């Protein structure tokens, strides 16, 4: 869990879902992206099944160049802070980033023709102890 950040009225953030004390925001806010990168590191580096090379143990961040081009869906609880996230990369942003992140992991040749009409969603995670489905459902609803 991260420090609670009040995103109401924060530049570069837009609330998409307001569910009481839990909000889903779409953001490019550096402070929120930093909190997202810390959550991703905590989830991806600490849990079994992920690569040992995910994130930077020195900074305790899971970050790459795509973060600078993407928009980020962030689940923020008024009490617990950032509890979930997903990274969104629309076609113009993918072009600016040098391509889809997925293309570094998979051969996307077969779906190249639809690339201009899709948004890549990746780096999605929810904090341990909060994986009861509500946060994931709200991220998808946004």
Predicted regions and their residues:
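A broad, low-specificity signal marking well-ordered, structured residues that form hydrophobic/aromatic
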Residues: 22, 86, 119
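Generic preference for flexible, low-structure residues
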Residues: 38-43, 49-52, 60, 89, ...
